[in-house]
């Protein structure tokens, strides 16, 4: 029998200067200290878009409308205890100023500098796609 599939939605928030928001996983969490695209698990009955709208509010205190979420690509990666399926969306419009609500560090990063930020194995393949599209 294979690994359980965990569906996580992630968002590349892109500001007016073309920088992407990365969040550093806080101490005590799985993959602590690594940088990632904000997002979270898709709960039962949610679409990935619904999950992102909820997670962006909970984690960053911002409001996103579903039409502002553009699907970019996805990651499919096996960890030792589960298989991660992660659609990545881009968003250039939101309301509010992103603020770390869950103890995470935030950084606005130019796409050509994202490789300097250590990321989970599932996120790393997404960087080339982002550099090409942004």
Sequence positions of predicted segments:
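Generic C-terminal helix-cap and adjacent flexible tail
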Residues: 1-3, 131-134
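Conserved N-terminal beta-strand and adjoining loop/helix that marks the start
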Residues: 1-20, 41
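Active-site-adjacent beta-strand/loop module that shapes the phosphate/pyrophosphate-binding cleft
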Residues: 6, 15, 73-98, 107
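Conserved Nudix-box catalytic region and its N-terminal flanking loop in Nudix hydrolases
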Residues: 19-59
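A short coil-to-beta-strand element that immediately follows conserved catalytic motifs
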Residues: 63-73
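NUDIX/MutT-family hydrolases
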Residues: 88-90, 98-130
